[in-house]
Amino acid sequence: MPKAEAGASVTGLSESAYVAPDFLHTFPFDSSKIIFPKGEQKVQIEPECALIFQATWEGTKLTGLKPLCFGASNDCSIRKEGAKKISQKKNWGAASKGLSENLIPVDGFEEGCVLDDYRIASFLVRDGKVYVYGEDSAVRNYSYIYGQLIDWMLEKFNGQKDEGPAEDIHSYL
């Protein structure tokens, strides 16, 4: 799998073409560590199944997402006082999120595919003791999965408005 490089840019776009806040320009995933934000005390573990997609575009519209692989992820959040947007709670810099070093190829993205055989379970190690954290969940039982998940993602990427905690994601793409 290709890795994102620090300072990577999109071919043909000048730095001034980016409309996303500067803190979103930093690739947040790391497979070996999470660097906690300075001065923040309320970091929340969020175990997830991360999916890597190949995107299809028609002009500026995202029209398709093809799953390529998946792996365990820690989608950490900060319970940040005064944060108005989800991104302010979710992205605080390099190594702010965990992603498995070993990603598993997807053989399809519908009931009966390899994802049906996987579960997400999370454990916290503190003072040498292991604690169960959260629910042991079958990936196939996620509330949004397969076609429903892709449809929802395409709708959000293309049409979500900058309202309340949500942002106009399409303008960032």
Q: How should these model regions be labeled?
A:
Residues 1-169:
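Glycine-enriched loop-and-adjacent helix/strand subsegments that border the catalytic/binding cleft
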Residues 172-173:
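Conserved catalytic-core subdomain
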